[in-house]
From Swiss-Prot:
This is Threonine--tRNA ligase. PANTHER family: THREONINE--TRNA LIGASE, CHLOROPLASTIC_MITOCHONDRIAL 2, THREONINE-TRNA LIGASE. Binds 1 zinc ion per subunit. One of its GO terms (biological process) is threonyl-tRNA aminoacylation.
């Protein structure tokens, strides 16, 4: 057995650790490195190492769950003392001491009844056991520490040298906002020191780019806890940025033969029952009663588009029919997962639904992929695609799901477009392609999606007249390019660190007259630019020239234009170009040509 062997992958893509595999395992080996599967094992084991250290430092600690997550790992636990960020170094030190003891990580199994007796005085373990349907449970042990766990884990602590505990948070037991608040510590781990250093450097840069910090500095958006968590307010600068983004997408939809529509934001609950949302998504919906009838505020836009499609009879000649809407939706996200614009309870999707014949699936999916590609290139994002398959909670039979999933695979394979598979990650009504983008500092984000749906047309009896005059069901493609305006703007803000491209910058030009006598010239230029669709302002408040320039720089305005005697006399402008960091003078006409050229860069 190789010294670097830490597990195996079976034919279904499941990880088997060395403790579970046996000596003659024929599955594909997982070596100790920074591959996805290897990191999953390393990070899960580091979570247990952290728990062991916490137990030694705080003997009264009781542990709930410690999973691997996108940003590393965490453990939820109960402890009598308050643990803060300042305690993380002490816990890390203890973890390093434990590694030096060279403990192996061992696994044994007992019956669920035995486990209930073993952990009879630990209500958190009782809660974990209540969620396990199996009659046998596994326990992993290192030194004197042991914990309920299904694995996978590395063979020994010697693999866990490269880690960092990143933050302390609170977390409700089981995610239930009415339950007890536990302590949660997050961490990260890698196979080597250099990868850890690179990650920590990226996280330092991420702090500087935090969209919540930049959004406050640039006065883009705000939140008000008195009004409700997860409900953003768009301030004038943010609303201008958002409007520009909406307009770019609006024109791009029209040239691709989409038709704008709009549906109500609240529908009778029976509609959501028919669609399956009530049963499969009801816990995320806001429900209310009006005139004795139950209604649901929409969490998705698809039902409205179905009603519009059904309003008039459609022929095969009409297909594909493509509707798009900037649809406001509401979803009940738990307070613990809310995060600035990236996770909110009210948001606007750039949502579209394509009704097409089955034989049109591949061409329509490819057209959407082309649309995605043009948007991502515009904003300098690299991206990958992931096909997500049938989840546990789903509507429709397996055969329909298989047909839909294969349709997505065929569309991408047939055009040599690479993709990965996310087993069980689909929407409840159909498989999907998720668009994963990579930002300027290497972080990955899930944004757009393309979903194939045979189920909702069946449930709502959607039909079109075929060439032979028979009635047939269309296929429904759900798609969003950005995902939501809120999330995408949050990501854009961090991607560009607030230095937005000229064509979407909230204020694109700000004129700073040196004295009151120069203000008239500045306002004349502002009007000229505004008529050409260029957002401009005049900063003529009763502040010093330097303060007004600093304010414009803080707002990251692409062009700061100083107006003095020379500019007024010669009909010129003195420019400070934020992107190039250059200062230069142009005539009014030359300046207009430069701005118009940059404005044109925002077309897709």
């Amino acid at each position: 057995m190789s010294e670097n062997l830490i597990g195996y992958i079976d034919d279904q893509g499941n990880i088997i650790d060395t403790q579970s595999a046996g000596e003659n395992c024929t599955a594909r080996p997982i070596e100790f490195d920074n591959s996805e599967k290897s990191l999953e094992i390393i990070r899960h084991s580091t979570a247990h190492l952290m728990a062991q250290a916490i137990k030694e430092l705080y003997p009264d600690a009781q542990f709930f769950v410690g999973p691997v997550v996108d940003e590393g790992f965490y453990y939820d636990f109960r402890v009598n003392e308050k643990i803060g960020e300042e305690d993380l170094k002490t816990i890390e030190k203890k973890m390093k001491e434990l590694i030096k003891k060279k403990y192996k990580i061992e696994k044994y199994e007992i019956s669920k009844d035995e486990a209930l007796k073993k952990f009879a005085n630990d209500d958190l373990k009782q809660a974990v056991l209540s969620r396990i349907p199996d009659e046998t449970v596994s326990i992993y042990k290192q030194g004197d520490f042991e914990d309920l766990c299904r694995g996978p884990h590395v063979p020994a602590l010697r693999f866990l040298h490269n880690f960092k505990l990143t933050r302390v948070a609170g977390a409700y037991l089981g995610g239930d906002e009415n339950a007890e608040m536990l302590t949660r510590i997050y961490g990260i781990a890698f196979a080597d020191k250099e990868s850890l250093k690179s990650y920590l450097k990226m996280m330092e840069e991420a702090k500087k780019r935090d969209h919540r910090k930049i959004g406050t500095e640039m006065e883009l958006f705000m939140f008000n806890e008195e009004s409700g968590a997860g409900l953003p307010f768009w301030m004038p600068q943010g609303a201008k940025l958002r409007y520009k983004l909406e307009q770019i997408l609006h024109k791009a939809h029209l040239v691709r033969d989409y038709e704008p529509v709009r549906g109500p934001e609240i529908l009778k609950a029976d509609m959501w029952r028919t669609s399956g949302h009530y049963a499969c998504y009801g816990e995320n919906m806001y429900l209310t009663e009006i005139d004795g009838q139950e209604y649901g505020i929409k969490p998705m836009n698809c039902i409205g588009h179905i009603q519009i499609f059904k309003q008039t009879q459609k022929s095969y000649r009409d297909l594909p029919v493509k509707y798009y809407e900037y649809g406001v939706v509401h979803r009940h996200e738990k307070s613990g997962v809310l995060h600035g614009l990236l996770r909110v309870r009210e948001f606007t999707q750039d949502d579209a639904h394509i009704f097409c014949a089955p034989e049109q699936i591949a061409s329509e999916v490819l057209e959407v992929v082309e649309f995605v590609d043009s948007v991502m290139k515009l904003f300098e994002f690299e991206y990958t695609m992931e096909i997500s398959t049938k989840p546990e909670k789903a509507i429709g039979d397996d055969e329909v799901w298989e047909t839909a999933t294969q349709g997505l695979k065929d569309a991408l394979k047939g055009n040599d477009l690479p993709y990965t598979i996310d087993e069980g990650g689909g929407a409840f009504y159909g498989p999907k392609i998720d668009i994963k983008i990579t930002d300027a500092i290497g972080r990955k984000w899930q944004c757009g999606t393309i979903q194939v749906d045979f189920n909702l047309p069946e449930r709502f009896d959607v039909e079109y007249v075929a060439e032979d005059n028979s009635r047939k069901r269309p296929v429904m493609l759900h798609r969003a390019i950005l995902g939501s305006f809120e999330r995408f703007i949050g990501i854009l803000t961090e991607h560009y660190a607030g230095e937005f491209p000229f064509f979407i910058a909230p204020t694109q030009v700000i004129f700073v007259p040196i004295s009151e006598g120069h203000a008239g010239y500045a306002y004349g230029l502002k009007k000229k630019l505004m008529l050409e669709g260029i957002d401009s302002e005049v900063s003529d408040k009763n502040d010093s020239l330097n303060k007004r320039i600093r304010t414009a720089e803080k707002q990251r305005v692409p062009y700061v234009v100083i107006i003095g005697d020379e500019e007024v006399q010669n009909n010129t402008v003195a420019i400070r170009n934020r992107r190039t960091r250059e200062q230069y003078n142009l005539t009014q006409d030359e300046f207009m040509v430069e701005l118009t050229k940059q404005l044109q860069e925002g077309k897709i």
